Structure formats: structure tokens, C-alpha cells
Regions:
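Catalytic core of soluble alpha/beta enzymes
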Residues: 3-142, 169-178
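Short helix/strand-capping turn motifs
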Residues: 154-159, 163
Length: 179
């Protein structure tokens, strides 16, 4: 599960702890801060939510401030994943070279398709960064492409491919079934 945050960061730790209490220890729990924290808020959140045993924290700081992302990554015990900070191959290189994140979230629709995503994932692999393939709100056909891409890359260990769920008028609805 991946609860989303971004507004009212002072309340996020309590919400994450409530989710953990509701689902128990058997469920992996991640948190997407949606660029909503400054460094101090992020550090307070990590300490307050420590007992929730989060697996990953996604994009805790604003995309416009990559150095903040690096400071948070260096200061906390949890893997920090860049999402909004990764749009181009140059972003991947900057994140990897600067040690600004532990992981990257590659979204095919955001980065410009499979060819660009392959290069980004290769940069991440060379730098020792794990990858997740994520998605935007997109049709099931795009999700199927993301899944095929994720399964074809050796350093993609996570997928968050639910952007088609609840999409109204999806012309490719039913094109794939996950079991």
C-alpha cells in the first residue's frame, strides 16, 4: 500500500501509523510525500513513523530543490525514491551522480516512452539505484506497456501500475488481466 501525502505534513505520521495498525505487518507499506516536505518536516516524519516500518518514501521534497532531496536521502535510514525529480535522462544522471536518491520511479508516459526509459534505467543500474516502474492516470494499454517494460529490466524491483483503475471511458479496458 502507498498512502499519499503532500498537504499537512504534520499529520502524515499519524495517518501512516493508523494504516499500519489496520493492515498489520504482512503488508508492505510505502509513503508518497508528493513533494510536500522540507528537510526538517521529513526528518520529523521519519522519526515519528519509524514504527510503521515503511519500505520506501517517495519524493519527499520539491522537484525544484534537488539538493534538499539529497540532504534527506543522506539523513534518513529509509530508501528515498525520486519521482517528480525524474523526467529526463539528464535528471537520471544528475540524481545518480549526486547521490540524491536511493531509487527512481520511471513512468513511461512522463519520460517519453520506452526508448528513453531504457536509457534512464541503464543509468540507474550503473549507479546502483533500484527502480520502480510507475504510471500516470492512463489507459490499461499504457499500463500493459509499463508492466512489460518492468518485467524486461533487471534492476526494476517494484511496480506501481494502477493508473487505469477507475478511469472512465478507457478504450483499452479489459486488454489485460493481472492475477
Amino acid at each position: 500500500l502507498k498512502p499519499k501525502g503532500g498537504k499537512a505534513p504534520s499529520r502524515h505520521a499519524g495517518r501512516v501509523l493508523a494504516v499500519r495498525a489496520a493492515v498489520g505487518e504482512a503488508v508492505e507499506l510505502r509513503f508518497d510525500a508528493n513533494q510536500g516536505f522540507n528537510v526538517e518536516q521529513r526528518l520529523r516524519f521519519v522519526e515519528a513513523a519509524r514504527s510503521a516500518k515503511l519500505e520506501i518514501v517517495e519524493q519527499p521534497t520539491p522537484r525544484s530543490e534537488p539538493d534538499l532531496l539529497g540532504r534527506v536521502t543522506a539523513a534518513v535510514h529509509l530508501p528515498i525514491m525520486a519521482d517528480e525529480s525524474l523526467v529526463t535522462l539528464r535528471d537520471a544522471y544528475r540524481l545518480a551522480r549526486g547521490g540524491l536518491a536511493d531509487m527512481v520511479n520511471v513512468k513511461l508516459m512522463k519520460v517519453g516512452g520506452i526508448a528513453e526509459a531504457r536509457q534512464i534505467v541503464a543509468v540507474a543500474r550503473a549507479a546502483g539505484l533500484e527502480c520502480m516502474v510507475g504510471c500516470m492516470d492512463e489507459a490499461a494499454l499504457g499500463i500493459a506497456g509499463g508492466l512489460a517494460f518492468a518485467l524486461s529490466r533487471p534492476n526494476v524491483h517494484y511496480a506501481d501500475l494502477d493508473g487505469h483503475v477507475g478511469l472512465q471511458g478507457d478504450p483499452s479496458a479489459g486488454c489485460m488481466t493481472l492475477k
